[in-house]
Amino acid sequence: MSKDYRVLLYYYYTTIEDPEGFAKEHLAFCKSLQLKGRVLVAKEGINGTVSGLKEHTDAYMEAMKANPLFEGIVFKVDEEEQHVFKKMHVRPRPELVTLRLNEDDVNPNELTGKHLSPKEWREAMLAEDTVVIDARNDYEYDVGHFRGAIRPDIKAFRELPDWIRQNKEQFENKRILTYCTGGIRCEKFSGWLKKEGFEDVAQLDGGIVTYGKDPEVKGELWDGKCYVFDERLTVPINHVAPTVVGKDYFDGKPCERYVNCANPECNKQILCSEENEHKYLRGCTPECRVHPRNLYVKEHQLSPEEHQARLDALGEKLPARL
């Protein structure tokens, strides 16, 4: 199939006086171009990923670049065979990335870490007295990361400042490098690090996505794939020596396939092979496998007898019905 669609990833810190009004107008504009995706708008700027046919994404980029609010905006562009979203959403938010720093909030246009090009980043990672901090969530790290990067034990970005404070001794008197998918989280996080007293802080300009597209570094020193927040879920980065670092949630075998737990009240994202999805009814715990609203059971129209037969193989049982 020909790759007639484009996926645009972008952000821009600026001042949007009326995020609600802007979001409403921007949604209408995106729909007029038949785009699909997710765009967040806040008083501090805009952050989005959209997909559409090339002529439509070209028109979108042209309009955004012509808007004085977004002068100098940079788009990361991927080619795809189809849309990577089902709908188009533009939503106002208090923050573009949720750190909840309140009075300690950082304006990346005033305070942020030094931007390193992909080539500079590769060289910096190999230097002594340097630590590399992954600014993403644990499940993003697990499917792919820079070699030797520290994995903060966090489920959400807002937990990162507390984690840094609790582990501060690891980073004192060292150069800190930090990275994320497209760069937006690190713009604010690196500024926060400097505000906390860390003096030598740098970030990967354009994030992992830009690093993977650089014609010179070609994603070298990246292990696994990069998690993305659309229907693709992961994209390749290392075009020199690709590896698999993700591990199946159930048996630990190499895996890069993400699914959501079939218990809608859990919805945990796990790495899981097709074989284990069927074996474990896409449930991440025994409780999720017997949940009365288990989506796997519903999708495959399993009768109670068929459901129990699957559980028998695991030594588990459906709860007794009253």
Swiss-Prot record:
Organism: Shouchella clausii (strain KSM-K16) (Alkalihalobacillus clausii)
Cysteine pairings via disulfide bonds: none
Function: Catalyzes oxygen-dependent 5-hydroxyuridine (ho5U) modification at position 34 in tRNAs.
Protein name, UniProt field: tRNA uridine(34) hydroxylase
Homology family: Belongs to the TrhO family.
Record-level Gene Ontology MF annotations: oxidoreductase activity, acting on paired donors, with incorporation or reduction of molecular oxygen
Origin superkingdom: Bacteria
Stored PROSITE patterns: RHODANESE_3
Limits of the Rhodanese domain: 126-220
Pfam families in the cross-refs: Rhodanese (PF00581), Rhodanese_C (PF12368), UPF0176_N (PF17773)
PANTHER family assigned: RHODANESE-LIKE DOMAIN-CONTAINING PROTEIN 7-RELATED, THIOSULFATE SULFURTRANSFERASE/RHODANESE-LIKE DOMAIN-CONTAINING PROTEIN 2
Gene this protein is translated from: trhO
Recorded catalytic activity of this chain's protein: uridine(34) in tRNA + AH2 + O2 = 5-hydroxyuridine(34) in tRNA + A + H2O
Cited InterPro entries: Rhodanese-like_dom (IPR001763), Rhodanese-like_dom_sf (IPR036873), Rhodanese_C (IPR022111), TrhO (IPR020936), TRHO_N (IPR040503)
Enzyme class: oxidoreductase
Keywords assigned: Oxidoreductase, tRNA processing
